[in-house]
Amino acid sequence: MPIRHCIVHLIDKKPDGSPAVLHARDSELAASDAIENLLADLNDSYNAKQGKAWGFFHGESGAYPLSGWLKQYLDEEKDFTAFSRVAVEHLQKLMEESNLSTGGHILFAHYQQGMTEYLAIALLHHSEGVAVNAELDVTPSRHLDLGQLHLAARINLSEWKNNQNSKQYISFIKGKNGKKVSDYFRDFIGCQEGVDGPGETRTLLKAFSDFVESEDLPEESAREKTQTLVEYATTQTKLGEPVTLEELSSLIDEDRPKAFYDHIRNKDYGLSPEIPADKRTLNQFRRFTGRAEGLSISFEAHLLGDKVEYDEAAGTLIIKGLPTTLVDQLKRRKD
């Protein structure tokens, strides 16, 4: 993963309305194994996050200036340090306006993955821990806690430059601590949501279920194709890459690689050629689960309508082909 440029600044800010104090670095970070490892770990943590949103830049304006500064950098009108400095000063201002915001180290990294260039911007925090030193003493230790990555964005620079109609070249973590906490960071990026990841994923899964039903596939074949879809989409999610419908179609049916893709287009599901899959929605598709009042039920989604029948009006499930161990337990209880 070649790293073109990388720099870190610090904004000291507590969520109590106090001023945000900027400690800006004057030069880029030199290339090192530590930087490589940091970016690799950051990518892994970011890709694993649930609840990301996808979108595109607002039109450049005084309220959303980042895209203009980024364009100046890419056009070599600003160097990377100058770009990051003016950007972090803007973030400092937005933090001061958001009383709930907390400061931290702001990472800017321009890097390449495969043939694609990205800009990552992340707010990083430390965790306190302990370490054992060379003298075998236990000492306090601070480290960047990438597991607590709550505010970060990734801009696909190649997509932004080459596809003017794209509405999903920016992804960002929406945050779990309330809408207002993360809104200032989204406004800093200047991003408007263009793609509903969970909604697009649900539509894709609905299209797949309709396809399986229309093909009247045997249970084993349906299970294999379901597994193929989930594994491919999950892998793409881990890589931070979108699901490509044509590629997915060729994996689902190697003998008829366009069958599923043509089904989607002919039925007009309104799906884009590439969609950002949502991990949580995929997991729900893999299995149905529920627990209440001492009862726990879990079964693979493809069994619904076959070995498991749901009567919505009566609110009941009929399960066929019970596991032998469960049948034995029930018989012993009856005896």
UniProtKB/Swiss-Prot annotation:
NCBIfam families: PRK00378.1. Belongs to the YejK family. Transmembrane segments: none annotated. This is Nucleoid-associated protein PputGB1_0980. Keywords: Cytoplasm. It comes from Pseudomonas putida (strain GB-1). It comes from the Bacteria. HAMAP family: NdpA. One of its GO terms (cellular component) is cytoplasm. One of its GO terms (molecular function) is single-stranded RNA binding.
